[in-house]
């Protein structure tokens, strides 16, 4: 209990905060974060912790606590990080078209008439890239009209902003319109942390997590640890923000950031642009981080002003200068610290098949020969949510102009994807689009396109067994991700390096040191690229048809239609609640090696089934490699009959045989797609037992009523085989104790010959997650509460 003096302190500061900031109305499109409310919460935290120094991430998280005094009870903050579950109130939700379908189908089951927080839908994942916007956009709209109509009707019914096809990529639009210093938001996409480039805490989640925020249900997050990255020096020449994160990925690996928020600090931060910081935060997903963020800078202020949000910058100035809200306290403690000298960074090339295989450009040529990677580069692609800012494009076009002046054009197919209609229109006004097209580049629609596998590639077939090399400025490069071909090697790097490589077409080419032979026999060498942080003439609005109603009101008269015969959309049937007994399953599959969400629930051609759980479940784990046979997408019934993996899952579901999958480290790495949890649940999966999980996927499994367990002893992975019976021994007791049983589950393994043994497994279930499990899913649980209100 606070003393009367402390209660007076908080009350007095509440009045101060309220008077310093513009009032935040219930207008769902308010751009200014609720600073007065956040600072009042922070005051309470400061009192409880005896004014302990806080990191920026802690300030933003704790200021969004539903009940600060209940959540933070100790001045020792080290007992919270990595241990305590926080109940949070996010400020907004953003959803892309592929994941929004399932999120909204789940939201519909709650019976609410509007969302509890501002929300937006962005149609970017379902647009195919092939011939350019003029042809690709109408074709993609026609193909996906049913889905777009469904999403738009949901938006109208519930008062959600609807950014239609062609408007841009979700993360670029969020940065341009919604992200703000100190904001906390959720997004149904793993690269939602892109918004951290503007000082927000933005976290990628599955649709069921988004429904928490949409329904006003406190959203739960295990308090992350804080990884501090100290930046010194200044980027120069060819080095870019992309190289900061590709280098960091090499240092930390794809799971080195799991359980952490990455917070950047140091004098080097002030030398970066806002969009450069967004690039760095975007690919924090590739190291497994919960999210990434930057302290408020002058670059943020410039970007806010350039995107018509001067009032946000003014309020942020007050929050920083009067209350020190938007930066870490002086003596804030990080759980780990990594230092990177920006002045010493050289361009990096990451890949193939994993975003953490990082190679400095000076070593790439030699390494590519040693590894026998294809030396001919077959395509160059720039853009994506990671690198489609005006600054990126202006630096790239500087290289294009240099080459054009020398009489050179790209020697391989070269694709450009603008991040938004605002970016595209500004590039068009400034003549940059014309320069790209005059020099052989194909400018695609404002959408994800090839980055998410929506690439109708003609020069290489999906079934080609020959390896080929592409260079992209994307963020992820798993097998078959971009063009459906498992033998395409995607090397991730900056858009500047991609562009230069497109003029050479040779993996041995290093644009920092090498020249290209001209037809006249002379040598041409690129000079380091130059560009503008922001357009000198300001941003161009672009075509009105690509902008939504900015302040939509919910309309309960709008009918949301789902055709029962549709193969694209399907209303959800609730999963059955837990029966109160121990789980007894058979091991269906033992997975070997990397198993990302692309392996578990592939995108590409499967994106069209995102709103139809039954149909998309036919792709479950089709990319997984069977540890026992080395085969991909092969599993064997108890009698030895061969099936594809989802085929066996369906058979066992029909037989009434629940199943378990065994896997290795970082299971579920990659995107936020909850279908990777929904489909196994739909097909009868009850347990996932792995060496370690990626954060988002583990949460998604819990939300859908699947029990995620990790080996207490990793060597036990080697003791289990497909066909074994796996049953829990103390699940009932664990649930009776609301998960507080020491975090262990005893698991009995019985071999086909009757031999049995017991192993220890670990769980991370909170009380709320236990309630989800008992109800059958989080949506069942929320629905039960709503019906009883």
Swiss-Prot record:
InterPro entries: Acnase/IPM_dHydase_lsu_aba_1/3, Acoase/IPM_deHydtase_lsu_aba, Aconitase/3IPM_dehydase_swvl, Aconitase/IPM_isomerase, Aconitase_4Fe-4S_BS, Aconitase_4Fe-4S_dom, Aconitase_dom2, Aconitase_mito-like
Co-factor remark: Binds 1 [4Fe-4S] cluster per subunit.
Catalytic activity, EC: 4.2.1.-
Pathway: Amino-acid biosynthesis; L-lysine biosynthesis via AAA pathway; L-alpha-aminoadipate from 2-oxoglutarate: step 2/5
UniProt keyword annotation of Mitochondrion present: yes
First-level EC class: lyase
Catalysed conversion reaction: (2R)-homocitrate = cis-homoaconitate + H2O
Domain of life, source organism: Eukaryota
GO-annotated biological processes: lysine biosynthetic process via aminoadipic acid; tricarboxylic acid cycle
Positions with a binding annotation for substrate: 96, 189-191, 476, 481, 610, 672-673
Induction: Constitutively expressed with a small induction when both glutamate and lysine are missing.
Chain positions recorded as [4Fe-4S] cluster binding sites: 385, 448, 451
Note: The fermenting yeast S.cerevisiae has 2 aconitases, ACO1 essential for the citric acid cycle, and ACO2 specifically and exclusively contributing to lysine biosynthesis. In contrast, in respiring filamentous fungi the ACO2 homologs (acoB) seem enzymatically inactive and the ACO1 homolog (acoA) is solely responsible for these functions.
Function field: Catalyzes the reversible dehydration of (R)-homocitrate to cis-homoaconitate, a step in the alpha-aminoadipate pathway for lysine biosynthesis.
Family: Belongs to the aconitase/IPM isomerase family.
Protein name per its UniProtKB record: Homocitrate dehydratase, mitochondrial
């Amino acid at each position: 209990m606070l003393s009367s003096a402390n209660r007076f302190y908080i009350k007095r500061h509440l009045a101060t905060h309220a008077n310093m900031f513009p009032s935040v109305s219930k207008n769902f499109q308010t751009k200014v974060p609720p600073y007065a409310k956040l600072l009042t919460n922070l005051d309470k935290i400061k009192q409880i912790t005896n004014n302990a120094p806080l990191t920026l991430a802690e300030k933003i998280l704790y200021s969004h606590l539903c009940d600060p005094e209940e959540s933070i009870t100790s001045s020792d903050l080290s007992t919270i990080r990595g241990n305590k579950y926080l109940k949070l109130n996010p400020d907004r939700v953003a959803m892309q078209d592929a994941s929004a379908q399932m999120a909204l189908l789940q939201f519909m089951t709650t019976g609410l008439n509007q969302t509890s927080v501002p929300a937006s839908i962005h149609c970017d994942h379902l647009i195919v890239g092939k011939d350019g916007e003029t042809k690709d956009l109408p074709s993609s709209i026609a193909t996906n009209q049913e889905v777009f109509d469904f999403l738009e009707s949901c938006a109208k019914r519930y008062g959600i902003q609807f950014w239609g096809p062609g408007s841009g990529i979700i993360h670029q639009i969020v940065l341009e319109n919604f992200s703000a210093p100190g904001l906390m938001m959720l997004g149904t996409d793993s690269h939602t942390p892109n918004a951290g480039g503007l000082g927000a805490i933005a976290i990628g989640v599955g649709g069921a997590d988004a429904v928490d925020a949409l329904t006003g249900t406190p959203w739960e997050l295990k308090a992350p640890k804080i990884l501090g990255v100290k930046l010194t020096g200044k980027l120069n020449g060819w080095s870019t923000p992309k190289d900061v994160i590709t280098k960091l990925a090499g240092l930390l690996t794809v799971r080195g950031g799991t359980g952490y928020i990455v917070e950047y600090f140091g004098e080097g931060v002030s030398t970066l642009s806002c969009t450069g910081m967004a690039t760095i935060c975007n690919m924090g997903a590739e190291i497994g981080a919960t999210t990434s963020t930057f302290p408020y800078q002058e670059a943020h202020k410039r970007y806010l002003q350039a995107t018509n949000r001067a009032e946000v910058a003014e309020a942020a100035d007050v929050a920083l200068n009067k209350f020190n809200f938007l930066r870490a306290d002086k003596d804030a403690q990080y759980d780990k610290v990594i230092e990177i000298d920006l002045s010493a960074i050289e361009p990096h090339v990451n890949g193939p098949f994993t975003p953490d295989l990082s190679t400095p450009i000076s070593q790439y040529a030699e390494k590519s020969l040693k590894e026998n990677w294809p030396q001919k580069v077959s395509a160059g692609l720039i853009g994506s949510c990671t690198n489609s800012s005006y600054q990126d494009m202006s630096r790239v076009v500087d290289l294009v102009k240099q080459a054009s002046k020398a009489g050179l054009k790209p020697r391989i197919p070269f694709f450009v994807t603008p991040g938004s209609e605002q970016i595209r229109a500004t590039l068009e006004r400034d003549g940059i689009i014309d320069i790209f097209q005059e020099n052989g580049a194909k400018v695609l629609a404002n959408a994800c396109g090839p980055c998410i596998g929506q690439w109708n590639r003609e020069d290489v077939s999906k079934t080609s067994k020959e390896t080929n090399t592409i260079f992209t400025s994307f963020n992820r490069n798993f097998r078959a991700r971009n063009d459906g071909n498992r033998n395409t090697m995607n090397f991730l790097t900056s858009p500047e390096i991609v562009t230069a490589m497109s003029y050479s077409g040779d993996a041995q080419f290093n644009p920092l040191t090498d020249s290209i032979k001209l037809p006249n026999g002379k040598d041409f060498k690129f000079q380091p690229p130059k560009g503008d942080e922001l357009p000198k003439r300001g941003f161009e609005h672009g075509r009105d048809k690509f902008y939504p109603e900015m302040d939509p009101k919910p309309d309960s008269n709008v009918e949301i239609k789902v055709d029962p015969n549709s193969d694209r959309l399907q209303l959800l049937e609730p999963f059955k609640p837990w029966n109160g007994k121990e789980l007894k399953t058979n091991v269906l599959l033992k997975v070997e090696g990397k198993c990302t969400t692309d392996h578990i629930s592939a995108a590409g051609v499967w994106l069209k089934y995102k709103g139809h759980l039954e149909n998309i479940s036919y792709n479950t784990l089709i990319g997984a490699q069977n540890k026992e046979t080395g085969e991909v997408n092969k599993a064997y019934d108890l009698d030895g009959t061969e099936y594809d993996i989802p085929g066996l899952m369906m058979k066992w579901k029909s037989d009434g045989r629940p199943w378990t999958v065994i896997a290795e480290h970082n299971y579920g790495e990659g995107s936020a797609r909850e279908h990777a949890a929904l489909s196994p649940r739909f097909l009868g999966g009850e347990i996932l037992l792995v060496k370690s999980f990626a954060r988002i996927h583990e949460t998604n499994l819990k939300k859908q009523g699947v029990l995620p367990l990790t080996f207490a002893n990793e060597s036990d992975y080697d003791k289990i085989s497909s066909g074994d019976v796996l049953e829990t021994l103390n699940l009932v007791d664990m649930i009776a104790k609301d998960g507080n049983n020491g975090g262990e589950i005893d698991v009995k393994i019985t071999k086909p010959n009757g031999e049995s043994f017991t192993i220890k497994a670990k769980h991370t279930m909170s009380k709320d997650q236990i309630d989800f499990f008992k109800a059958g899913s989080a949506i069942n649980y929320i629905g039960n509460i709503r019906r009883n209100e």
